[in-house]
């Protein structure tokens, strides 16, 4: 994973994305910043809207994002985190508690879980695919597969539908 100077994760490869996709990526980066630096939700949203979304930062041009989508994800994850984390924990394998995951992976899973829960108007396949793509931008190993499996399990629990996952059974 690459980092920009402030320590925020940045994708490995540039890719085209729609405004909601860019908002999802920015939300993951903002959630990472909040987790690592202890930045508050109002501060991080204001920073991203004023200085990052659609702006040039340290020679890197940020793509235009849907600011309302960005705000909704960040604020929604913060508001629902106490409900989301136990759901994510249940969807992980028993030897991988949420606390063991790095901050970027936690941010991806929290944002994806929130969208599955709160944005019933967005198809499950779109949400899962978008967050798997975000994981692929940061990781080259098994993490994108983990994101796919966890979000698919959560979709089954939250929405009663999935892209093929089976619920995790405790032995």
Swiss-Prot record:
Keywords (A to Z) from UniProt: RNA-binding, Transcription, Transcription antitermination, Transcription regulation
Any one GO molecular-function label of the UniProt entry: RNA binding
A GO cellular-component term linked to this record: cytosol
UniProt-listed Pfam families: NusB
InterPro entries in the record: NusB-like_sf, NusB_fam, NusB_RsmB_TIM44
A biological-process GO annotation: transcription antitermination
NCBIfam families: nusB
Functional description taken from the UniProt entry: Involved in transcription antitermination. Required for transcription of ribosomal RNA (rRNA) genes. Binds specifically to the boxA antiterminator sequence of the ribosomal RNA (rrn) operons.
Protein family: Belongs to the NusB family.
Protein name: Transcription antitermination protein NusB
Organism of derivation: Brucella abortus (strain 2308)
Lineage: Bacteria, Pseudomonadati, Pseudomonadota, Alphaproteobacteria, Hyphomicrobiales
